[in-house]
Amino acid sequence: MGNRHAKASSPQGFDVDRDAKKLNKACKGMGTNEAAIIEILSGRTSDERQQIKQKYKATYGKELEEVLKSELSGNFEKTALALLDRPSEYAARQLQKAMKGLGTDESVLIEVLCTRTNKEIIAIKEAYQRLFDRSLESDVKGDTSGNLKKILVSLLQANRNEGDDVDKDLAGQDAKDLYDAGEGRWGTDELAFNEVLAKRSYKQLRATFQAYQILIGKDIEEAIEEETSGDLQKAYLTLVRCAQDCEDYFAERLYKSMKGAGTDEETLIRIVVTRAEVDLQGIKAKFQEKYQKSLSDMVRSDTSGDFRKLLVALLH
């Protein structure tokens, strides 16, 4: 995980003993001290929370997750438990949940797999194998089909070029290949799209999209919308959006999870928790710019209770 916006520790400096004691006290006896739980979980980095879990188990002989499960409930519990996982473990659990049982929640597979770096994909695959004793790739293959399966399997290879160099000639060639594979023929040749969208660096893709605009006179998004549909379209558009501006993509996902009637709490939790130490500050700025309101304010008006308090604390 890139730590360019890592959450600072508590002002007094991180003290794992004190935190473990405080959490134990918060869960002891009658009632639960939710404020103490919120303060510690939201005010520590992911690595520090791992240390607290280990310390807690060593000191009290109990798993902190199990203790919190018995003390908390609802979306507050879900968020607290999400914060106790390493980011790769939490993403792996989200993917497994999206696939298990009847039906598959493709939007979760797309959001997670289309937005991660090679290193993050590899960590998620390892966590999945460790937690569920199964291969993520095999499960994705078994749970998806057709061209969506192909692009997700391509992404699981973690084979994207992550260099900074831009090859203008390649951008022009890729733009032409994308045109020939989509608008330039009957039906769409998804292999060309997969090859380009799953393997080129984000910088290279931006050059390709520009070349496409010049060559064809329309946005790559427009072409994708005309040529594809359903989940495949969602996956391609997510890859394009993320190459252009991943923070913008997540800002929009957050906005859509809250606007209108009802709130998609799962998406809200997933994005706030998984982006907290990656690009949440940038997402907040983008959200403000796009919607003329702060993400914290919208979360405040859309959630309640301790769930709201924990999310708002994570957003600061």
UniProtKB/Swiss-Prot annotation:
A lipid is attached at residue 2 (N-myristoyl glycine). Keywords: Annexin, Calcium, Calcium/phospholipid-binding, Cell membrane, Cytoplasmic vesicle, Lipoprotein, Membrane, Myristate, Repeat. Its main location: membrane. GO terms for cellular component: apical plasma membrane; basolateral plasma membrane; cytoplasm; cytoplasmic vesicle; exocytic vesicle; extracellular exosome; extracellular space; membrane. It is a lipid-anchor. Detected in epithelial cells in colon and jejunum (at protein level). Detected in epithelial cells in jejunum. Annexin repeats lie at residues 14-85, 86-157, 169-241, 245-316. GO terms for molecular function: calcium ion binding; calcium-dependent phospholipid binding; phosphatidylglycerol binding; phosphatidylserine binding. One of its GO terms (biological process) is negative regulation of Golgi to plasma membrane protein transport. Pfam families: Annexin (PF00191). InterPro entries: Annexin (IPR001464), Annexin_repeat (IPR018502), Annexin_repeat_CS (IPR018252), Annexin_sf (IPR037104), ANX13 (IPR009166). It is found in: Apical cell membrane; Cell membrane; Cytoplasmic vesicle. Belongs to the annexin family. A pair of annexin repeats may form one binding site for calcium and phospholipid. This is Annexin A13.
